[in-house]
From Swiss-Prot:
Protein name as catalogued: Nucleoside transporter 1.1
Function (record text): Sodium-independent high affinity nucleoside:H(+) symporter; transports adenosine and uridine. Can transport cytidine and thymidine.
Family, similarity comment: Belongs to the SLC29A/ENT transporter (TC 2.A.57) family.
Comp. bias intervals (Basic and acidic residues): 260-273
Region (Disordered): 260-280, 290-309
Transmembrane stretches, start-end: 27-47, 82-102, 109-129, 136-156, 173-193, 209-229, 333-353, 361-381, 395-415, 427-447, 460-480
Pfam family, one: Nucleoside_tran
Keyword Repeat tagged: no
Catalyzed chemical reaction(s): adenosine(in) + H(+)(in) = adenosine(out) + H(+)(out); uridine(in) + H(+)(in) = uridine(out) + H(+)(out)
Length: 491
């Protein structure tokens, strides 16, 4: 994948380059971004696409189709427990990825290591029933895989969001599209498999093998694609050496003038580098000494590199990046992203698609519709017309995020059948899904483009912080959903 350096005309921020204008190396990075997005959510989607298998996992683990569970409360709420363990683990682990000792780990090790852990999660779910265990062993397996999945996802997700935060925004949009496409693929496969295979003991077992096999296959391809990315010249322009060796770019400095931004979207220079002031923005292998000093005490770590040294590695630059200073600069996009996913995971899937439990197809079709329009929303930032017209109009994204609170009464009323009919539910899933994808993706794209995020080290940290915002909002939303459904079941 090693090609000559890419020279192109300036590219507007938020506008993806036409496919016929791309070099092979640039197109390959888009493919990798998409595959990373798909792989990020595949384990969770694979598990949720075969609920009958997980809810009766004890039978397969005990190798007894007639087994009667002793831990009925656990198996009645196994999906909730699995999801909650994964989210809480991610919420604890992902902020730890910003600690200096973790940032010293080469990024390629983090990417590949996180992906391997996600693959191990699915392998464990498949191996335990093959070997056999007790019901208590099955419970322990579900809890352990929830923890393993949350641990691996926190490493892979934070590194992926951070890495593509250093690229032009269209790469983040593509990655977010991959996250949504993961749900579309599993939903579509669920419809096909549900129509083709019976809901018997053996039929459900075959369904699980299809979902889990697809997951491992996609993640295996992503693993290979990430290894090849190390030799991609376009990726090296933006992300240097992936933390493997000393950067080819000499240590330099960025003048304080680079901190001054206009209200216009940043553009890219002839090599596609992000530039908002007409000056070259150094790659993630250069030193931002003057810029760090201009930020004040919060950025004291960033001034630790001498002016004239051999180019440090990418992860060394990350260690020298101030976290709280970066968080202050992305705070509004952080809040918008967190609240967006709070509303989504509060209502979806339990409340938004669970109002017709006796219907064989409503929940399946409703989830599919949500996933399709969620993907469309996630890809929408690739269109320039979907962007705020100026930097000052970024408040629109924050307002749109908080405006999504209107879905709470609309879907709760439908859930309690005060608003009857399945057609209403399908229409709501269209709007609900698109708004989730658009607001979430736009916030993730705009976060690393905030004023003061003027080098790739800060963009990496900003991208990681935006990933954490998803977990913060998602955790609160999931807890609220559990509380709401518990009250609903009680009263």
């Amino acid at each position: 994948m090693d090609t000559a350096p890419d020279h192109r005309e300036p590219q507007e921020q938020g506008e993806s380059r036409k496919w016929y204008e791309m070099t092979a190396s640039e197109f390959y990075v888009y493919v990798v971004a998409f595959m990373c997005g798909v792989s990020m959510m595949m384990p969770v989607n694979a598990v949720f696409s075969a609920p009958a298998y997980i809810m009766t996992y004890y039978r397969y683990a005990m190798q007894d189709p007639e087994a009667v569970p002793l831990y009925t409360n656990f198996w009645n709420n196994v999906m909730t427990y699995y999801n909650l363990i994964g989210i809480v683990t991610s919420l604890i682990m992902e902020p730890l990825t910003l600690l200096s000792w973790f940032r010293r780990i080469p990024m390629k090790v983090r990417l590949l290591g996180g992906l391997v852990i996600l693959i191990v999660e699915i392998i464990v779910l498949m191996v335990v029933p093959a070997r056999g265990t007790s019901e208590a062993g099955a419970v322990a397996t579900i809890c352990c895989t929830g923890f393993i999945g949350g641990f691996g996802k926190s490493i892979f997700e934070s590194t992926t969001y951070g890495m593509f935060g250093a690229f032009p925004s269209s790469f983040t949009s593509t990655m977010m599209g991959g996250v949504g496409m993961s749900g579309v693929l599993t939903s579509l496969l669920q419809i096909i498999v549900k129509a083709a295979l019976p809901d018997s003991y053996e039929g459900v077992k075959k369904q699980s093998k299809i979902y889990y096999g697809l997951d491992v296959g996609i993640q295996g391809m992503t693993f290979v694609a990430l290894i090849l990315l190390r030799f991609n010249s376009f990726a090296q322009n933006y992300f240097g050496d992936l933390g493997a060796v000393k950067s080819k770019v000499d240590a330099g400095k960025l003048s304080a003038e680079a901190l001054c931004h206009t209200d216009e979207h940043p553009t890219h220079d002839k090599e596609g580098r992000n530039s908002s002031s007409g000056k070259e923005v150094p790659a993630l292998g250069e030193v931002q000494t003057a810029a760090a000093k201009s930020e004040g005490p919060d950025a004291v770590e960033e001034s630790s590199w001498p002016h004239e040294v051999e180019g440090p590695t990418s992860n060394e630059i990350l260690v020298a990046t101030a976290i709280f200073s970066t968080l202050r600069r992305v705070k509004w996009m952080f809040v918008a992203c967190a609240f967006n996913f709070l509303i989504t995971l509060f209502l979806f899937p339990g409340i938004a698609v669970g109002m017709f439990p006796d219907s064989k197809w409503f929940s399946t079709i409703a989830v599919f519709i949500f996933n399709v329009f969620d993907v469309l929303g996630r890809f929408s930032p690739s269109l320039k017309l979907m962007w705020p017209r100026s930097y000052k109009q970024r408040w629109i994204i924050v307002a749109a995020s908080f405006a999504r609170v209107i879905f709470v009464p609309l879907l709760l009323l439908h859930s309690y059948h005060y608003i009857p009919g399945e057609a209403y539910g399908y229409v709501m899933e269209v709007i609900f899904g698109f708004s989730n994808g658009y607001v979430g993706s736009m916030a993730l794209v705009l976060g690393p483009q905030s004023k003061g995020i003027d080098n790739d080290g800060k963009r990496f940290v900003a991208g990681t912080l935006m990933g954490i915002s998803i977990l913060v909002g998602g955790t609160i939303g999931t807890v609220l959903s559990i509380m709401t459904q518990t009250i609903r079941a009680t009263y």
